[in-house]
Curated annotation (Swiss-Prot):
This is Putative transcription activator BRLF1 homolog. It holds the Pfam family Herpes_TAF50. It is found in: Host nucleus. The keyword Electron transport does not apply. The lineage of its organism: Viruses, Duplodnaviria, Heunggongvirae, Peploviricota, Herviviricetes. It comes from Bovine herpesvirus 4 (strain DN-599) (BoHV-4).
Amino acid sequence: MKGIIYPRKSSADAYVYLSPGVREHLFSLLVKYTSSQRDSPAGSSTKVAPDTPQTNFIVEIQWVCHKILLEMEEQFGSLGGLVADINICLIWTLFRNYKHKHRMNNSDTGKSCAEYAQSVVKHLTERMVYCTDKFFINSACSGVTVPQNLALVIASISQVCRNKCQGAWRRMGNGRRTLIDLGLQLVNTYNLLNACGAIDDKCKAFIKLTFPYLNLETVYSPVHAASTGLHQKMAISLYKGQEKRKVPNATIYSNLVTQEKFALPEILLGEITDEGLLANKGPDLEKLLSEPQTILKLVTKLSPVSQFQVFMARWGDKLPSHLKDVCVSDSSQLPQQYENFKVVWPQHQTWPNDETSALPIASASLLSLQAENLPTSVQNSVAQETTGLPPQVPAGEMPPRGNCPVEDHGLLNSDAPDDLSGKGDYDLFTSDDLLPMSSGNVAIPVCEDPLAPPCKKQRMEPPDPLSTPGDNQWGDGAASAWIQSYMENEDAYLELILQGLYHLDEPPKLEDSIQVQDVSNSTNDPLEGPSRSQASCFEDTENIANPLDLFV
């Protein structure tokens, strides 16, 4: 075994609070990875060690990373996203340090891992630089009180990652022990301060928003493609930039140290493309943090359990038999109807964790705005602006082609049908499964006719609370009670909803039916989320000037 460097147990087993089972599994994968790189005998094209199929090896590594995400969420809660990034970066640093390019052609087990290890480490390092930088800028602008000891540890992590970004990429494998020590110090400091009550709920909610969980599909998709011979043109990157670029010599930064200056990493100057990171809507997040308990109960489509569900459905058959039976919890099981039905689900939402209780609800009324309490003129005005139909259109009749309205099923009447599934080609969505204390449903038309002109969402301008009776299209007066209540109580959640990042873990239980779409004969992959026509009604929501325009 001349020339082969095998990992040492003491160094390869060092991570930030991983369970013994996960550490043992990682060490066995690393040994298999290095063993597959042994030289072939002279004059022979056969490999010394039998190889594991490359795809199965990558799937097993991804399975371990999913287990890490689940452990970090269970142990550290809001801080789990940052600790998970550190641990996954440590794993790929080992793959990068133990690879041998001139021997990889003799191996099928870890060839694609060796090719992409450098890119993955760079991606995770830049991700930590971006998130830690946003942490300090947004906390100061949002009125978040961060304990000094916790801020010092996060600043040290940011400094280590910045130094890696400014140096040559061939040095990305350095500093693993330093990152481990800082990760342990981060967890110990956070737990100690939390036990003393020094970290309030607002700070925890802010940490959760700033350090989201990594989307493992972003990292492993190009690795899977490389294992099948489909190399992607561009490596894994966190921002839009040149594919190949010469790294400046470190000497150009030497004079900055004496002047107490520093160079900004390139990641802070480019446009971020990584999924899940909080969009840069400005540094002031005080509105979002007005109800921190609500944010702490929110989950993302990138939550560990949601990612684990999709992973097991897609790659479960590639796992060894002793891993297929491992279940994280009862909530990690996919719904039974997942194989044949795809729920009409917004573009940025996660798949449900259980069967019918968390499925999106199709409301039986276009106006859950307490319509029975509104004047008749207001009901007619809202109906016409929302559906694009005159108030007196008989049930079942459709207006001329091209208007793309929502079908009128007599929903404004007391005898409105309770089941809307399968009626027409127009999908109805509700905001009750998205917003707490919601007072209104969303009904946005979806244009399914290929011959019709582009579908435009029709919106109403919200009334001015200070206006006098008769000043606006709402009929008999100023803003109704429901719109005033919405503006006072739910403004803090609007930005989250518009960005499409979060939804309630336990949506309100309504008595309406569930709208599902049979895709058993469809060519769409049920794991890829809703089709383009279904998701089109939620596009461009981030560009809405007034958030209230989304609900009309």
